């Protein structure tokens, strides 16, 4: 018989840096998950060099026998755009102050990377979504 799902926990954790300290510990404690076991598994899965410095969204499914499974998503589009543009953070007033530039090619690469997590029907729709995120961050898109 299949295990009964008792809940889902959604978190955003730095890649390879899950610790029992807040905010991870309290969120998992409420769901009655073995916190250290989750931290070890998450850190092992996200320890690769290409994810270093990114925040990774994770969806943890909790079962009635206190076991769990988790699915990691791709880093947020804003993190990928910030890395591509080489800026620390987006603009406070994106219509006036531009903080960086990304090329059309970089936007396409980000869209392809984000495609599994976006609810876009095509790569073109994903590209438009990433362009919108870049505009709202004050990042210019150059050909």
From Swiss-Prot:
Forms part of the ribosomal stalk which helps the ribosome interact with GTP-bound translation factors. SUPFAM superfamilies: Ribosomal L11/L12e N-terminal domain (SSF54747), Ribosomal protein L11, C-terminal domain (SSF46906). GO terms for cellular component: cytosolic large ribosomal subunit. Belongs to the universal ribosomal protein uL11 family. One or more lysine residues are methylated. Gene3D superfamilies: Ribosomal protein L11, C-terminal domain, Ribosomal protein L11/L12, N-terminal domain. One of its GO terms (molecular function) is structural constituent of ribosome. The keyword Ribosomal protein applies. SMART domains: RL11. Part of the ribosomal stalk of the 50S ribosomal subunit. Interacts with L10 and the large rRNA to form the base of the stalk. L10 forms an elongated spine to which L12 dimers bind in a sequential fashion forming a multimeric L10(L12)X complex. Disulfide bonds: none annotated. Transmembrane segments: none annotated. One of its GO terms (biological process) is translation. Pfam families: Ribosomal_L11, Ribosomal_L11_N. It comes from the Bacteria. Keywords: Methylation, Ribonucleoprotein, Ribosomal protein, RNA-binding, rRNA-binding. This is Large ribosomal subunit protein uL11. It comes from Koribacter versatilis (strain Ellin345). InterPro entries: Ribosomal_uL11 (IPR000911), Ribosomal_uL11_bac-typ (IPR006519), Ribosomal_uL11_C (IPR020783), Ribosomal_uL11_C_sf (IPR036769), Ribosomal_uL11_N (IPR020784), Ribosomal_uL11_N_sf (IPR036796).
């Amino acid at each position: 018989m299949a295990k009964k799902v008792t809940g889902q926990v959604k978190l955003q954790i730095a890649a390879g840096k899950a610790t029992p300290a807040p905010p991870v510990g309290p969120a998992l404690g409420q769901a009655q998950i073995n916190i250290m076991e989750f931290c070890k598994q998450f850190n092992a899965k996200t320890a690769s060099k290409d994810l270093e410095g990114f925040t990774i969204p994770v969806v943890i499914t909790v079962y009635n026998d206190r076991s769990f499974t988790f699915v990691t998503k791709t880093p947020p589009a804003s993190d990928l755009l910030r890395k591509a543009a080489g800026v620390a953070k987006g603009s406070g007033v994106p219509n006036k102050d531009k903080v960086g530039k990304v090329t059309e090619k970089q936007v396409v690469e980000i869209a392809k990377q984000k495609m599994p997590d976006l609810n876009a029907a095509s790569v073109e729709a994903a590209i438009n979504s990433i362009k919108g995120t870049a505009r709202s961050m004050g990042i210019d898109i150059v050909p």
